[in-house]
């Protein structure tokens, strides 16, 4: 709103209010929030480092680029039970559930920037079974699997 001062026909001051609407050229989407459980997983990723897997860098990048993904997970193998007491976390595969439209950008970033040895996609019935939803049954690029040797 914009207030202006003017005089009426009798010479008395009059206050006019002029409504002004500003429409941004780019639609403003609400900021995505990282859930508490996802923060725990990002902390685990940040603490994991081996060969070319630089967990701290990957977790930092994922936090800054949260608009590109729905969830990330670095599951461990049961061999971790043996060595966890010594502080070792045996995990070599990062799973990313991307936001639509960011699938191939995320794959390229994992390969080029973070030197994943292999990347592949989980889609169709396998993705449906893993996520427990039929919404992804007809999609080929649902979960990005990035593996480091």
List each model region and its residues:
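Long, contiguous N-terminal structural blocks used for assembly/anchoring
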Residues: 2-118
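Acidic, proline/glycine-rich low-complexity IDRs
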Residues: 117-149
């Amino acid at each position: 709103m914009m207030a202006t001062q003017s005089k009426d026909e009798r010479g008395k001051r009059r206050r006019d209010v002029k409504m002004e609407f500003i429409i941004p050229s780019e639609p403003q989407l609400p900021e995505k929030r990282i859930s508490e459980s996802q923060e725990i997983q990002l902390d685990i990723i940040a603490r994991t480092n081996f060969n070319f897997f630089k967990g701290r860098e990957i977790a930092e990048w994922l936090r800054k680029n949260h608009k590109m993904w729905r969830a990330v997970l670095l599951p461990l193998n049961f061999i971790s039970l043996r060595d966890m007491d010594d502080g070792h976390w045996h995990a070599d595969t990062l799973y990313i559930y991307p936001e639509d439209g960011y699938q191939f950008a995320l794959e390229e970033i994992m390969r080029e920037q973070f030197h994943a040895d292999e990347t592949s996609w989980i889609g169709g019935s396998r993705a449906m079974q893993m996520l427990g939803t039929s919404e992804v049954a007809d999609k080929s690029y649902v979960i990005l699997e990035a593996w480091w040797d």
